Amino acid sequence: MALVSRVNSPLRSRLATERYRRQHDELSALSASMEQKLEGVQAGESATDLRRLLAQYSGKLSVHLRMEDEALYPRALGGGDASLQRVAAALQRDVGPLHEEFQRFLEAWPSAATIESRPRDFAMQLARILRTIARRMQREEAELYPLVDALE
């Protein structure tokens, strides 16, 4: 299940949100890779590669959230556009609980062995958290990024 897909356009490289969109693409690609590996783990294969991908995903997500927190959201909230401020405030409010949920997920699955011991539980929880994050990225791209790009 592809969680976020998008066609690259020449305009994207000129947008203020280009690097955030690229990070979304990278996170989506890692999601797809994890989903592929998950099939093998559910069939009894080692979860080592899957746990490594999850660690990569976690690292990229942390960098992405930090960049948004330090640059994107302050810019959006500090701009003069009331619509942009409203959208940014709503999205920023939601990110804390989402990040906490993801951290709890990581703590519950600290190793390949824990994944291998309960692959079905892991699969259900992974699918749920990835869907939640994908929906969040889609909202940013549909609601926030066009408003930020319009400031340019």
Residues covered by each model-derived region:
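Small-residue-biased structural context
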Residues: 1-152
